[in-house]
Amino acid sequence: MDGQKSSNSISPRDLYEKLGTAQAPILIDVRKPADFAASDRCIVAAFHRAPDDIARWSKELPAGRPVVVHCVRGGQTSQTAAAALAAAGHDAAYLEGGITAWSEAGLPTRRKLAVATGKWVTRERPKIDRIACPWLISRFIDPNAQFIYVPDARVLAVAKETGAIPYDVKGVEYTHEGERCSFDTIVRIHDIHDPALDRLATIVRGADTSRHDLAEQCGGLFAISLGLSANFADDHAMLKHGMVMYDALYTWCRSLQAETHNWPATKPLPQAAV
């Protein structure tokens, strides 16, 4: 097998190209408890599970979605976990080189912060930041997060009642800071470094704070967001469609900025009737 790539492995770069969208695999950190505790970083969107308890937690994984597991260096721990998941019927692979190779490649990690109940609450009738933030949380922090929309006056009370994290309201941790919006604050607190996400953050900031000069895409995001809000009375229905929009915008920020689109030069224009 020298020089050959394992059929059940994935490179850091190939995994990165899948992240940030609904097509991303479930990403599970199977570092041994001591290794996990010794580090203050984790790969974005990954959640930790004990490698010696696979028989239990594998039953909780949704059917039909690919799974990628990683350990420190892509060695026996993650390879054994991937094999066990495959034997249980999952489409499983391990990350080549583990979180070490991922980090050395400059790919995005986040600060390892506990996220309370996994619930987040904000004001109803979202437009930009309150759709962009759930996308960011779901795609980069907690893929199992739940989002609650309530009247402005009820946000803090509902947060206290449910243990949900309040965001994009005055006086809380996850909110606007100066000229930066709540999306920026989440990126800062969780210490996520990703050039594509930085580009997207600029677009969101410009659209959310009426500074469309920050990036030429700001005005387009503003227009589409207001149009979505006008078309959906149900905030969660709007969020569902907004997730697709931000998946597409993030993909463009990451991989498609060099793409162009124009009328094919080789295609003759129709001739006007004489």
Q: Over which residues does each language-model region extend?
A:
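Gly/Ser/Thr-rich loops at beta-strand to alpha-helix junctions
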Residues: 73-77, 126-127, 154
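Flexible, polar/low-complexity N-terminal or interdomain linker segments that lie immediately upstream
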Residues: 1-38, 110-133, 139, 262-268
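Short acidic-hydrophobic, aromatic-tinged amphipathic segments that line or gate anion-handling sites
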Residues: 49-50
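Catalytic cysteine-centered active loop of the rhodanese-like fold, especially the PTP/DSP P-loop
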Residues: 54-101
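Short, structured coil segments at secondary-structure junctions
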Residues: 42-44, 88, 143
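Extended, well-folded catalytic/binding cores that form a central cleft or groove in large enzyme
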Residues: 117-125, 132-268
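Short loop/helix-cap segments at secondary-structure boundaries that form the rim of catalytic
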Residues: 37-44, 157-161
